[in-house]
A protein has these predicted regions:
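Conserved N-terminal Rossmann-fold NAD(P)-binding element of oxidoreductases
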Residues: 3-7
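N-terminal Rossmann-fold NAD(P) dinucleotide-binding loop
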Residues: 12-13
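C-terminal amphipathic/interface module of NAD(P)-dependent oxidoreductases
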Residues: 45-52, 247-281
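Glycine/proline-rich active-site loop of Rossmann-fold NAD(P)-dependent oxidoreductases
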Residues: 136, 150-152, 162-173, 178, ...
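Conserved Rossmann-fold NAD(P)-dependent oxidoreductase catalytic core, especially the SDR/UDP-sugar
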Residues: 90-130
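Mid/C-terminal beta-alpha module of Rossmann-like enzyme folds, strongest
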Residues: 200-250, 256
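Catalytic helix-loop patch of NAD(P)-dependent Rossmann-fold dehydrogenases
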Residues: 115-156
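NAD(P)-cofactor binding segment of oxidoreductase domains
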Residues: 63-103, 140
Length: 281
């Protein structure tokens, strides 16, 4: 198995290293020479390039699968739509004819639900903000490109809020400093631990999924106050400081029953009570 990874960040790098451990051949796109050297030391073949520079993508190899997990780097001073949509178009125009399978990592921000109702793969997408619309537009690019290519398959995975080791740093500082935490305390949070993201991505990469779209979230949405209270308990800090003003935004609750049923996934961290203790460093 040869996998090409576009977006070797929090999720992509972990996937790459585990793929190497499985004996897979792994190639990853990176923008910097220093990063390329680190990837090479980990057994990953680097290709230096940028999704916004089409000529730099010509060196991307033929592979069995592409995992596309590009995140938005605010420090890069690049437009989010350019990165998510134009960059995706650039990559797919280069690889779609020679890499038969794509796993595209998207976001549950494509749903605009704010009343606390449940959403799943069948729920109409009505993004509430520009970020969600950009993610939805990127999904449309994937569907359009792969609909034109026979014997080519694309799977879109919409992730809820990612957490895990190294992803709770800002939250820890807020709690320890007793700084007010924004958002409706009674609003719903939907989370997925990085261990479960990796588990699902490897299942998708190793088999032939029956659906082209999956939503991935843990088994129990939590009220915002509940999440921060659980985190505070494990950090041994005072209870979270939350705003008192009423809010009409209760968010959404994500139902990931399809992915658990169709792929036979048994989540490693099905609730925050399982995931937070293994995420605190």
């Amino acid at each position: 198995m040869h996998v090409l990874i576009i977006g070797c960040g929090y999720v992509g790098e972990r996937f790459a290293k585990q793929a190497v451990e499985r004996g897979w051949q792994v190639t990853a796109l990176t923008r910097s020479q220093k990063r390329a050297e680190a990837l090479q030391l980990a057994g990953i073949r680097p290709v230096i390039g940028n999704v916004l520079e089409p000529k730099s993508l010509q060196a991307l190899p033929q592979a069995d699968l592409c995992l596309y997990a590009v995140g938005y780097d605010r420090s890069a001073n690049e437009n989010k739509r350019d990165v998510y949509v134009s960059g995706l178009k650039n990559v797919l125009s280069e690889i779609a004819d020679r890499i038969p399978r794509l796993i595209y990592v998207s976001s549950t921000s494509v749903y605009g639900e704010s009343t606390g109702d449940w959403v799943n793969e069948e729920t109409p997408c009505e993004p509430a903000n520009e970020s969600g619309q950009i993610c939805l537009d990127a999904e449309a690019v994937v569907n359009e490109v792969y609909a034109r290519n026979l014997n080519r398959d694309a799977t879109i995975v919409r992730l809820s809020g990612i957490y895990g080791p190294g992803r709770l740093i800002g939250r820890k500082e807020q709690l320890r400093g007793q700084k007010p935490i924004s958002g409706n305390p009674d609003g719903w949070l939907n989370l997925i631990h990085v261990d479960d993201i990796l588990q699902v991505l490897f299942i998708l990469a190793s088999g032939t999924p029956s659906s082209s779209l999956y939503l991935l979230s843990d088994e129990r949405p939590n009220r915002r106050f509940e999440f921060y209270s659980e985190l505070a308990k494990h950090l041994q800090t005072p209870a979270p400081v939350m705003p008192d003003e009423p809010s009409a935004d209760f968010g959404k609750r994500c139902d990931s029953l399809r992915i658990r049923n169709e792929l036979g996934v048994k989540l490693l961290r099905p609730t925050i009570q399982d995931g937070i203790p293994v995420s605190i460093e």
